[in-house]
């Protein structure tokens, strides 16, 4: 059984790509058709490739991989944070700081500073400092937390990176490739897929689409860590859905009201 059904993908709007004039020709094989100037992603391929991504992430988690979720656009920020936390992994959901992976030593120093400020508050140091200095420390902490809070406890450079919109996260993807870190990503029709190791053709601009795919990747991690029973509820939900015999042509017509 597919980890994500065609019905779920359709309802989340995963099939809507970008305007045809904004496409990347390298995504041609993942495009089903064009409707009203918009590319329609081939959901049959998305179903198959989402399965492959799920298995890849699950197997990595089973081998105790450190997995980093990356998505800094507003449509992805909440899902990336929530699902990474649910899976017991790490995330960056605001601006990617150049060198986050390739200059990990410097990033660790900034994380150490964040933890130092937290300790200062916990041990009572704040109480004996001037209010102006405490205000400056809080301002510094807020900035560090915003950009590095999601990786503050990450023990090492990640073994796998899951990315929402690698077109936007090009710097992150380049750093991962430089270090040989495999990248699993939601790839829309405007993106060059060449640097992505495990591609999930999908609309990366719709909040529901991002939530659906990101949640399934988190499910994969949970299953890899705890075994199949941990995602039994998800599978039961899918099993309860009536089997669909509709073709992608029929599904596209349904969503467009034809």
Curated annotation (Swiss-Prot):
Pfam families according to UniProt: Ribosomal_S2
InterPro entries according to UniProt: Ribosomal_uS2, Ribosomal_uS2_bac/mit/plastid, Ribosomal_uS2_CS, Ribosomal_uS2_flav_dom_sf
Gene3D superfamilies: Glucose-6-phosphate isomerase like protein, domain 1, Helix hairpin bin
UniProt cross-references to SUPFAM superfamilies, sorted A to Z: Ribosomal protein S2
Annotated keywords: Ribonucleoprotein, Ribosomal protein
Membrane-spanning ranges: none
An example Gene Ontology molecular-function term: structural constituent of ribosome
GO biological process: translation
Gene Ontology CC terms: cytosolic small ribosomal subunit
Family to which the UniProt record says this protein belongs: Belongs to the universal ribosomal protein uS2 family.
Xref: NCBIfam families: rpsB_bact
Official protein name in the record: Small ribosomal subunit protein uS2
Record organism: Streptococcus suis (strain 05ZYH33)
């Amino acid at each position: 059984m597919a980890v994500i059904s065609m019905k779920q993908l359709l309802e989340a709007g995963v099939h809507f790509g970008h305007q045809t004039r904004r496409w990347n020709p390298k995504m041609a094989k993942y495009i089903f058709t064009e409707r009203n100037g918009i590319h329609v992603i081939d959901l049959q391929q998305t179903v198959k490739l989402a399965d492959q991504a799920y298995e890849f992430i699950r197997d990595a988690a089973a081998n105790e991989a450190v997995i980093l979720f990356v998505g800094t656009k507003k449509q992805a920020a909440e899902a990336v944070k929530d699902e990474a936390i649910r899976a017991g992994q790490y995330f960056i959901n605001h601006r990617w700081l150049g060198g986050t992976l390739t200059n990990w030593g410097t990033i660790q120093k900034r994380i150490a500073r964040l933890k130092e400020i937290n300790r200062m508050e916990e041990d009572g140091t704040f109480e004996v400092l001037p209010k102006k200095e405490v205000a400056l420390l809080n301002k510094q902490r807020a900035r560090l937390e915003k950009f590095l809070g999601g990786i503050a406890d990450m023990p090492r450079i990640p073994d796998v990176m899951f990315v929402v919109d690698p077109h936007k996260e090009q710097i992150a993807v380049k750093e991962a490739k430089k270090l040989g870190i495999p990248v699993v990503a939601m790839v829309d029709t405007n993106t060059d897929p060449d640097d992505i190791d495990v591609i999930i053709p999908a609309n990366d601009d719709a909040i529901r689409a991002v939530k659906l795919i990101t949640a399934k990747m988190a499910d994969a991690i949970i299953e890899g860590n705890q075994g199949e029973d941990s995602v039994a509820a998800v599978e039961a939900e899918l099993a309860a859905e009536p089997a669909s015999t509709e073709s992608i042509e029929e599904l596209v017509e349904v969503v467009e009201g034809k």
